[in-house]
Structures are given as structure tokens and as C-alpha cells.
């Protein structure tokens, strides 16, 4: 684009409040931190040596993997395959939540009417087979990921993109259905793979039939040694095309990144202590306090740290499947939540390490507080016919608090009494040894999980529910089986974590939108179907300023919390990690927004002793 064109676009943005953008990057809101000629990100060591290895366990509850295709619903792909083997047009940073810089695309140009964006591909970009990354590959990837053969979340994420047009060998245009400041970022997040991936005699297989075909991506790593279902190693591509790019300088320094799979937390932790792998993130406060101890920690062989971060909090809770008749009445869901004594759990089990999750955007500016503000009311009033009056007149619901003070009105007995009143209003009364509805059906609840770690929480919760006449069955199954049941919504209550975002947007359609409630494999596991929620999500994704986004998300949070779709859990403001001493070095500056596993594998590097050991192994 000419200098005059850039100046004109900047002037238009200034006058009309358009999203800020520049050829080398795009910012949804505000300014772009790094200029076009920047050398490297501040939080990396540009001179980090290459070599050595790091071995980890996946931060999820993955217990197996059976495919190399991370883009389809059936089966489980290895951890980090998408981020290490495949790449996107733009790449985000760990210090700017709503800005992305050119990776496969060397520049992005937003149309003056903001209804399309053109990405120009970097002529250096190459797939692992040596082929250039071309516009036709970008279109192919988009078409495949929005087809019925792909996992449903991709059709939701890219639902506001009407299509992709190849303009030239290295230029591709994404066409948008409406003006939406997030859409260039969404387009830029498209994973790109070669048209040749899955080809058989020049004919492409449907995406869902590409299972164990070796991926043809452009990322810094290729698949190395694999023990299917148990462990996988990624080998650094020494001829990686972007190794000298500013957005990759100082990144991906290990020659090998390996992941090991263990069946449960106990086996995993014991293996870590025995030296089977290098790095682990802890999620259970009791384990962190009592199990991450011993001779190896005392001697300094193993290091445990609590790392500060600026991430938005994750929403974690026991999620109700509101497709089940027993959970359709909000009073039943609210009553069940009253039976969980978080304060007791925090004292007795969690070493007072947690704060209570309050809303769906915990720990961020997007969390609703008090009564609706004037800005929220302006959003809620047009939806009055869909909402209960208390949304407008009462403070946003808070998770129940259990007090030890008998005069507080909030003892466990008080909460259970309130729960019983709600259940009675909903038609559930105690008779014949159980809580029953007018048809005589007993209220029984199955808590489904893939690990028994939550059992110590469910047990006291179940005892309180039994006082109301509700019987609880806590069932632990393999993660792969659990995932299959979640995909078809075959559950009653699950413990689940909804990952937070510094700028929530289109992903909310799949998490809370009515359409996603009926799509197998979608993230709306709670089955939320609410016209007000749909309307507010639509407002969120069309926000043109950060202030608009804040008010719209607060209104959405308020409506969701009045729906009592989950029993909120707890969260921590730190990352708990442990790793082997003397094997790694880290940049001097820690970024603000990061996940520990990605931070370690992306920008840490091997220590001299690690490099020396690796050199001996190679010889």
C-alpha cells in the first residue's frame, strides 16, 4: 500500500473510530506495540542457543491419542500438535491480548468498508515438504475447516466469514458478513496446511478420513519418534523457514519437545519425581502442598514455583446438562449450588489457596458487579421479554457463602433450608425415601469425570445433597470415553474448565449460543438456549471499541449468572509449576499473558549441561 493510502486510512480510523491496523500487524482495539521494523519481542532472548530437549506432560486430562489430525471431532490428537506443526497467517503475542503480527502473511490490509481483509503471504513461507505456502493452500484450509468433516467449533469460529477468494499466487481475501473488529484476527488465526496432506494419487481424502497421515504443515517442528497413545516427540526443523523472522527470533529453541501420557495424576507425579520428564503444571492445591515435596525438592534437584500472570481467569465449575428434564428449572440448579460448601472445602482441602469463581469472566473487567449500570440497562431493556425482572432490579447473583456464625443467616443449615424451599417451589418434595417430582421420579444426579481427583470434593457435596433427599453417583471413566460422551451430550453433571480470554468474542457463540446447543462436539455442553444470551453475544462480537466490549460482556455475564447453569468452583491467580533444576534457562522478562507449557516450550532454552548431554547422545 502507498504512503498516501496508509495516511488516508489512519485519518479515517482517527475520525470514525475504526480498529487500529498497520500492514505488518492488526490490533482489534488500541495501538500496535511493535513497529514494522521491530527486531524481536521483548520477552524472548534473541540470542538463545538452539539444541537440547524438554519433556512434559499435557496440561489437559488427555489419556491417549490416536490420530495426527487435530481438526476433526472423532479421536484425540497428540498434545501441542496444532501449535508446533501447523501455523497461522498471523501470530499473537504474550504481551498484547488483542494484537497479532504477520507470520505466514507478511502483511494484512483491511478494506476501507471493513468488510474484507487481504493477506499477502510471505514468499519465504514453506511447508515441511519444501512446497511454498500459497493462497490456494489458505483457501483449501478454510474450505476444509468449515466443511461438515471438520470439528464443529471451526464452523462457528469462522461463521462470520462468508468466503475466501484467491487474488493471486500469494494474496488471499477474506470476505466478512458484517463489520466486526475481531474478524481480521479470526481470519488471521486460520491454521494453514498443504493441499497435499491426505492426498492419494493426487486425489484429496475428506478431512475426517485424514487420520494418521503425516501432517504437512509449516511450523517449527515435525513429528519425530512416536509411541502411539503413550508419548510423542517433536523434532525441530533445522531449515524452518521463519527462524530469522522477527516474530520467531528467540523462539522454539529446543531440538526436541516430548510429551508423555500417564493414566492418572499419581502416576504422573511419581514419574516426574523419578526423572522421567522435566516440566509439570500442578492444578490441585492439596497435591501442590503435600505431594510436591521430598528429597528431590529439598535438595534443589526439582524446583517448584508459583508464577504470576495477567491472564483472565478461567471459569471452572460443575456444569449442568440442561437438556435433561431434571435440570430445566433454574430453581433446581440454584438449589443444588446452595449445597456446596466452598468455605469448608477451601479450609479443609485446598489449604485456603483459592478464591471463589463468581462469574464467567472472573478476574477481568468484563465481570458483572452490583446492579446493572446505565450502559448495561440500555442493552438489557430491549430484551425485557426474555428476562426475569430480578435481572434489572437485583444485584448480580454471587455464589453462596457458608458462614460459621449462627447469626449470619448463611450457615450451611440456612443454605440447605433455602435450597429446600426452591426445590419445593419447583415441585420436588420428599416422600418415599427420596426427593420426588409430581410424577414420582426421584432426583438422582450422576457426576461424570475422567479422574478421581475431584472425588474428595464431590463426597462432602454429595452428603449435603443427600440431606435434601438427592442421591449422587460419582462415576470415573477414561478421558477418551468421557470426551465421546460429552460430544453427544450424554451426561448429567461434569466438572469442566472454560478457558478465559483477555478479549472474549466469537468463541462465545460456540460456548453459550443456542445454535451450538444442538451441534454434537460443540462447546455448549450446558445446552444453553436463551434468546437474550444470543442477542448479547451478537452485541459482543460487533463491539467496535474496548468500552463497548466491556459493557456488553458485563451484561452477558449478568444474564448467564441469573441462569445458574453451573455450580462455580474456584481459581488461583498464579501458575504452579515444577521443573528439573539446571536443565533450562529463561528470558529475563516474563510476559503478562501466557500459559506455562507454551511459555516453556516456546521461549525457554537448554542450559549448557542440557546441550552437552544432548551432544553426547547425538554422538
Residue ranges and their predicted role:
Residues 122, 209, 242-292, 334, ...:
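Ligand-site clamp/hinge motif
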Residues 44-49, 72-80, 107-151, 167, ...:
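Aromatic- and charge-enriched surface segment that lines or borders ligand/interaction sites
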Residues 8, 120, 155-201, 218-227, ...:
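Surface-exposed binding/hinge segments that line
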Residues 75, 81-96, 188-251, 255-258, ...:
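Gly/Pro-rich hinge or "lid" segments in bacterial periplasmic/extracellular proteins
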Residues 163-166, 224-235, 260-324, 331-335, ...:
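Extracellular/periplasmic solute-recognition and catalytic clefts
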Residues 25, 58-60, 80, 227-232, ...:
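Detector for C-terminal structural segments
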Residues 102-106, 128, 133, 175-195, ...:
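Aromatic-rich, solvent-exposed beta-strand/loop patch
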Residues 23-112, 140-143, 216:
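N-terminal lobe/hinge region of extracytoplasmic solute-binding protein
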